[in-house]
Amino acid sequence: VILNYAFGDICKGMNTTNNNFNTTYTNNFIEANALKFKYANQYELNSNLFDNSLSYFNNELSSNQNVFIVVLEPGRVRKIQILEYTNTKVVFRHGNIDNTDTVTVTMTLNPNNNYNYYSFKNKDFVLVEPANNTSWDIEFTKYTTLLTEFNSTKYYGVTGAIFNPGKKFQYTFLENININDVDLAKASSLSLKTDLLGIGYSWKKFSSPTNDGFYAIEPRTYIVKDSSKYYTIQFTEFSKLIGGTTEKGYPQFLQNNL
């Protein structure tokens, strides 16, 4: 179970360790427990909000039915309880922390997708992934991770590339190497690693602590292996000039199929 990591460091929550969904919570309770709030994505070890909510019993997943409080964005808070989790469906309920607007949802799991999506705002399922979860390789998105920038270590919302979790990609990278200087012989001689965030965000470096700062692109080439095929990737841009203003969020890269 993950939250929409595209919200960055806004969307987070806490496990109340309480099974009674009818318990009323207040904004004062949320503020008092702010330090207990965690993120929920699979790309950062400390972003494990829901990790202890499910357990295996007789080779099947079961829920401990703990109630979670989730801040979806400033001023929008919901409580969530997973009632049932099987290989084919998830049953959960959610509502406001004052016990209003409670909804119980049965979500049928699509085996062709890595994830199945639901909107608390619209109270409906959302189609996000392509119909076939093997039809894509990397996703460019925003996610939350712990990092140090300008002598400050904290959780940041970063933008980067994530491998398709439904595939078994391996990767490495070479610093100060042009993409055209890496051939198949060179790529196949390298030791590779497995990590969904193998490409991640570090191919660019923020050059200023202000929001209008520019990004410098690191001079590195990524080597990616999918099954027996090798690819190389080298990023060239993260910004784009639009109407005379430099806007971030437009990654460009070179690719070679070896």
What are the language-model segments listed below?
Residues V1-L258:
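Surface-exposed, beta-sheet-biased, low-hydrophobicity segments with strongly acidic/polar composition
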